[in-house]
Amino acid sequence: MTGSVTEVGFRWSTSSGNLGNTATGTLNGTPFSASLSGLTAGTTYYYQAYVKVQGTGDKSSTVSTFYGSTNSFTTSSLNTWLSNYEIPATTVASLSESNTLYEGRYCHDSVNETYGNTKACRYNTTDANQKVVTHTYSYNSKVVRNYSFLYDKTYKTALWVAYATSNSGDFKDNDVGRNDAWAYDPALDQSWQQNLSGAYSSSNGLRYDRGHQVASNDRQTTVEQNKQTFYYTNMTPQYSALNQGQWVELEKKVQGVATVTTGSDTLYVVTGPLFEGTLASATDKSGATCPAPSGYWKCLMKCTFSSPGVMSSAVGCAYLFDTNSSNIAPTVTTIDAIESRTGFDFFANVPTSLQTTAESQSYSFF
């Protein structure tokens, strides 16, 4: 068919079999282009170019459309705090450029930190009773991630807490001390949280402490960074003898590894509770009861970088406390074993070639 071109463009969609969206192109010779908007990050799109041609002579009232072959492209993932190496794989609700942008990273929304002049970033998950939060602090004129966690409204507990540490750069140990700045976490509604303005009441003959998941001594870079470890969301009802015994001993050993982790090395830590079997309960300052974990675990991965963003090696190990009612030393195990126990996929952003070996190792760092 001969005639004149009246329109060019693309039809497109996330489904190759249903290209229902149209973007009209600019008719200015060949090739032509069109702009697409409202795309979702990390998504594959399919498209076909089209040309509309109006006939001549006795076909002048006829407009025919010709289509090219189907092609595809994938949009880049949005930069989020969830892309850091310490973060377990967590299914969050979709993000787009219409969501909150903070310091070059996207989240569903953000809120001012109680301590410091930065913001906490909040992510919705596919479970309405769970949210992911990343706390941040300011150091050396930039915003730095402090720690992230997956919080569960039912247990009123973070199911995992993840952070990076070393003795250089953004996490340098400046020995700012313990600030005891107990406070509700500004990133979550207070109804989701335990009231830990004071100690737990004794329950079933067990005395529970407000047990840190990220230890105060793990965060010694700035005062604000340390204070954020006293948010109630970072606490669990932990058997007092365990919290002040084998648990703190493990924390000290982790801090010892962090102290000698400098330069191109970073230690990534994920810790969390177990909720298995019949659970004891603890009573907070408001008289509300909450489940006490049945045990705890801690996973470590020490990574070396040959250049910024290029990881060259990784070693891993894990520690398991099978009980929250005695002061028994942890069992040395593998990250794989903790993944099987909890259902989480740890260190999901570490390259698979390094992650697989590191997660199957069972020797202790100390």
Where are these regions (language model features)?
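Short, surface-exposed linear motifs at loops/turns and structural transition points
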Residues: M1-S77
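Domain-level detector for secreted/extracellular nuclease and nuclease-toxin modules, and
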Residues: T74-F366
